[in-house]
Amino acid sequence: VEKKEPLQGNEENISIRYTVNQATLYNNPTEASVRKEEIMPIIEYPKSGVLVSVDEAMNSPMLILDVMVTNVNSEDCNISIFQLVEKGKDNEVIWIGSPCYYSEGKDVESPEYYHFPLLPAQSVNMKIGWYINPDDCDLGKIYLTDNLNGGEEYTSYVNLKL
């Protein structure tokens, strides 16, 4: 498996460093060993302008990323920084969605679901999942990004090469 890391930027602006060890598109969450109660109850899928229920997601493809995360100097570690995007014409960034599954998450109903304790200089390996509709996007142009709403100079893109 090719390991993919984000481009390195200005070191003082890096709070979390991560490596995508593996990206796998499964036919459904069950194939990925993800149970229904581990998936967010309502999944926003802005690419096609729909909200996806857990029941729908259980019968839909799921992208699972195996990611190693290292806390460089962040006070609050939160997987919501990770977003899927598709790069369209002229490298236009089209948001696909937020994670709907997180291996370290405890309670999908909790507002703290996406948070994880990780002290500076510590690392954790985790699995992060997204509902994805392969008919609605070009799999070869899907990227993992961080800091999507921040400045472009602080945003990294990792081509998942699906």
Label the model's feature ranges.
Residues 1-162:
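Conserved functional micro-motifs across diverse proteins
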